[in-house]
Amino acid sequence: MKILVVDDEQLVRWFLDRALRKSGHEVITASGMLDAFNKLQSEDFQVLFLDLRMPEGSGTELLAKLEKLNRKPKVIICSAFITSELEEEFKNKGICTLKKPFKLEELNNTLQRCLS
């Protein structure tokens, strides 16, 4: 499965890249919204791991741009700033959430839940 990981924190990108590759996935990383948008325009991804807060724009801005591209990857919001209200809002849109910090087991469970 081809996965795009978008996070401004290098350590988070590295961890997700390693963990997801170990599970047999193809992983591409992006350090911000512009980099991610360019990759989303040129490649098809089945899953998008997306941070909410990044220096050059928010994850929700990228989601809005994604809709215009007519691309429909499964989305997992991966952020330390997920409130119960936001979690409910994302759930109603079919978007999964993973609150930082998280454990490997939580990552795997969230990915499986998002794909089912």
Where on the chain are the PLM-derived regions?
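Acidic, metal-coordinating helix/loop segments flanking the phosphotransfer/catalytic sites
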Residues: 29-47
